[in-house]
Amino acid sequence: MAYAQNPYRFLGALRRRYGDTFTLRTTKGPFVVTADPALVREVFAAPPDTFRVYPADVLGPFLGEKSLLLSHGERHRRDRKLLTPPFHGGRMRAYGALIAEATRAHVATLPIGRVTPVQPMMQAISLDVILRAVFGVHDPVRTEAWRRTILDDVRAVTPALIFIPQLRRPLGGFGPWARHLAARARFDAMLFDEIRERRRDAREGEDILGLILSARYDDGSAMADEEVRDQLITLVVAGHETTGTSLAWSIDWLSRLPAVRDRLQTEVDALGDSPSPEAISAATYLDAFCNEVLRVFPILPDVSREVVRPFTLGSWTIPARAAVAVGTALLHTDPRLYPDPHRFAPERWLDKKPSPFEYTPFGGGARRCLGAAFAIYEMKIALATIVRVLRFSPANEKPSKPARQNITIGPHDGVLVVARKR
């Protein structure tokens, strides 16, 4: 339970006691954690069929059993190849304008001069980006229907349900599990209706769902409806909460560090009145700022895998069915890698390219987050859009603290700030 409540503190205490690599004894067997970059390289460089996702029994009921995050081996390779194109290159950049549009719409509703938790707005921006980019939903009535159904589903997934499987019982239609099942049934119905309508009308479109439906495996077959549904649920769950939370942490830092805020605003202002998404994405200090946000408060404290067959890690042999985790939160706060690691300093990235074995906010290797490039792209455009028109001051003297929020870690108070127009 200590890990579930505050994994940053829990893992940090273990490293201070045992060093960069240590083993936890859990009810599921040995759980090996490493924050040694040389060993991280070994984990990420291992053949893809060395591992499978861990713990699948925790995530499966919420993401769908055929989710890319849960698949392994040949199925993972095939699905990842099919799903990759919309999240990279020109396909991804085509969504820049709609990210800015969604951000402007929500910024216009933010109370000015009053204490406001900013995380809900950031997650609303992220959700609207998903609705537009993934589902092609722009109409206000349809947007509200989708938004309500998705939020009901997301809010029904509580940390208790995730970490205490014994709670996953219907109890005659009452209780948290019954609420989750009911919300998921409504979301499933909406997703299947959309998938089948697209297939029936041969209306694929240029949104991510359309690209998935039109994509084909090497043998010419398409992804089945149930598999498409599980990928869409994963995109919503993984994309909505995570990017919105990183944006909220971004505002927290901007509200507390005037020099950082001013430097970022100066860079964004210099791009002109209507900068292109490409110009925003190429801004160097903005890139460094986003890297630093994800270093200090990574959304996931570690990247864990189950060992499929015995695996050699350094001088140790990890048995099958044990787990291996890359300690992201430990790597990111290692003073040997990042001097003064608890200081928020975007400039540390201006002359340093992130090492994939020292900086792992999106995991690494063959299972690196499929949407990593899209998430960074969205962060940059949303932040540039926001800082052009608003400034923030903190509502509390003490900064927000990381706390468990469903699967991920986020600010305990939603980041309380006061917004003012520039």
Residue positions per predicted region:
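Cytochrome P450 heme-thiolate monooxygenase catalytic core
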Residues: 52-60, 75, 91-245, 263, ...
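N-terminal membrane-proximal hinge/A-helix region immediately C-terminal to the signal-anchor transmembrane segment
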Residues: 1-78, 93, 97-105, 137-141, ...
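Conserved cytochrome P450 K-helix/beta-meander segment immediately N-terminal to the heme-binding cysteine loop
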Residues: 48, 310, 326-353
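Conserved cytochrome P450 K-helix E-x-x-R motif and the immediately C-terminal K′/meander segment
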Residues: 2-19, 193, 275-314, 335
